[in-house]
Regions:
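Cleavable N-terminal export/targeting peptides
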Residues: 1-22
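Short glycine/proline- and aromatic-enriched beta-strand/turn motifs that initiate or cap beta-hairpins
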Residues: 18-54, 58, 116, 185, ...
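Extracellular loop and loop/strand-boundary signature of outer-membrane beta-barrel proteins
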Residues: 31-34, 80-87, 135-141, 171-175
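Gram-negative (and chloroplast) outer-membrane scaffold detector with strong preference
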Residues: 49-131, 160-161, 174, 184, ...
Length: 192
């Protein structure tokens, strides 16, 4: 009985340790250029991945971009002319999940990824109560949580279990059509 218990423990711990070498975690600095507001938002994020195949990793990530001020224009709904400007703050939270194709061996790992998720825009409240004005970014004000698709490529360099990762891609959110936005992320990773 004791030998059977030791054998089962060895098998379970061995498979657990093997599974641990298939994971990756990291934090990153994030830059997102929002096309509708022409702002460059910066923030922090974290990512976790699990390797399901030698060259395929499923990753989930969440990033919080701090608020940036910009001038929001308001159009007169009868004439179509911009009649007011207001200083507005916009912040972004985005979460994405999907596969990453990455060469697993060696010290340099080029990769490509396609992820889906959400983009949540945090806009400061509007101070203009006039009923004949409409914001030029009305779609973001009425629907601040939007579906997103992210296609990117990059490279990671590792030395043992630690490394650095750089990626750039197009984060597309859907708000009255597809909106393309450049996104760049850079930060340390840990493989275990």
């Amino acid at each position: 009985m004791r030998k059977l218990g030791l054998l089962l423990m060895t098998i379970l711990l061995g498979s657990f340790c093997q599974a641990q070498s298939r994971m990756e975690a990291g934090i990153f600095l994030d830059s997102l250029s929002i096309s509708q507001t022409s702002t460059n938002n910066f923030g922090l994020g974290a990512r976790f991945g699990y390797r399901v195949h030698h060259d395929v990793m499923f990753e989930g990530e969440l990033a919080y971009d701090y608020g940036i001020n910009f001038d929001e224009g308001y159009r007169n709904i009868t004439t179509g002319n911009i009649t007011a400007l207001e200083r507005t703050s916009i912040g972004v939270t985005h979460g994405l999940f999907g596969p990453t194709l990455e060469r697993g061996a060696g010290h340099f790992h080029p990769f490509a990824t396609l992820k889906a998720g959400f983009v949540d825009f945090r806009l400061s409240p509007s101070l203009l109560p006039q009923s004949n004005l409409a914001s030029v970014i009305l779609g973001l004000r009425t629907s601040n949580v939007n579906a997103a698709l992210y296609a990117a490529a990059g490279i990671s360099a590792t030395l043992g279990p630690v490394g650095l990762r750089l990626e750039a891609g197009d984060e597309i959110y859907f708000n009255n059509g597809a909106r393309h936005n450049l996104r760049i992320a850079f930060g340390p990773i840990l493989r275990f």
